[in-house]
Amino acid sequence: MESDWKKAETIFKKIEQGWIITLVPLDATVQAKVNSWMEWRNFLNEINQKPKSTLGAFQKKAKALTLKSQELNNNIPTEFNTLSIKTRITALITKVKTLDLYIHLNPVPDKKVTGLIAEINDQVVSLQLQMENIVQRNQIPTEEGESDIIKMKDTTRAIH
């Protein structure tokens, strides 16, 4: 019994040390566009609060992150409602669900859990970079007549 407690304590300490979330600040233009996206703000708020006391607190956090990440598909701002953003959200959800799964195993595979934290960080950064990329692309002015050429190239509009 004593060794089970020590193992759990060791696992908790390793997860606590590895639970490092590093979010990159968004560009001011992107930030202004996502301010109204409540689900994104809720997810960031949840992910920024690190559990402190027990392994159970980390398990609750993983469950909460799963719910918040799944909500990211709701109310996506029009500019970001693209396949590239939705794909990154899906990848993020998958990583968070995997974290939730692993942290509830007995014994908890601490190396897997801390590895997933790093992967979740990467997914969030990837999503943020894609948002910035979209904003930058949309700021490039179109050439005169460019929109007509784009319409002509659209094969779904072609008359058959």
Model features per residue range: what roles?
Residues K50, T54-A57, K63, L67-E71, ...:
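Short, positively charged
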Residues K63-T66, Q70, T90-K97, A118-E132:
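Generic structural signal for well-ordered, non-transmembrane alpha-helical segments
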Residues M1-Q59:
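Immediate post-signal-peptide N-terminus of mature secreted/exported proteins
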Residues W40-N48, E71, D100, H104:
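Short, charged/polar, low-complexity loop and linker segments
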Residues F12-L26, V30, I103-H160:
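C-terminal amphipathic alpha-helix
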